[in-house]
């Protein structure tokens, strides 16, 4: 039996999914060191003051500007009718 090409069903919408990437927080490493210091030396330990100040400085630092959103899905929706040979939307 000859191999037939695989035919995919028609799509209602063309869409490109963005990768779900969590933003990395630069203060997580400092926070883990503060928690480790508290766990080993006690909560009110004076030896953890430098690490606590580093955490405060990190948390008070301004956040970086957000990246602009990708517009590929917008443009695909605009050109969908042309790409699907003018078939009507259902």
UniProtKB/Swiss-Prot annotation:
Oxidoreductase as UniProt keyword: no
Keyword Disulfide bond: yes
GO biological process: mitochondrial translation
Predominant subcellular localization, coarse grouping: mitochondrion
Keywords for the protein's UniProt record, in alphabetical order: Disulfide bond, Mitochondrion, Ribonucleoprotein, Ribosomal protein
Gene Ontology molecular functions: structural constituent of ribosome
One GO CC term, this protein: mitochondrial small ribosomal subunit
Domain of life the protein comes from: Eukaryota
Subcellular location field: Mitochondrion
Membrane-spanning parts: none
Disulfide topology: 27-58
Described function: Component of the mitochondrial ribosome (mitoribosome), a dedicated translation machinery responsible for the synthesis of mitochondrial genome-encoded proteins, including at least some of the essential transmembrane subunits of the mitochondrial respiratory chain. The mitoribosomes are attached to the mitochondrial inner membrane and translation products are cotranslationally integrated into the membrane.
Protein family according to the UniProt entry: Belongs to the mitochondrion-specific ribosomal protein mS37 family.
Record's subunit section: Component of the mitochondrial small ribosomal subunit (mt-SSU). Mature N.crassa 74S mitochondrial ribosomes consist of a small (37S) and a large (54S) subunit. The 37S small subunit contains a 16S ribosomal RNA (16S mt-rRNA) and 32 different proteins. The 54S large subunit contains a 23S rRNA (23S mt-rRNA) and 42 different proteins.
Name of the protein this chain belongs to: Small ribosomal subunit protein mS37
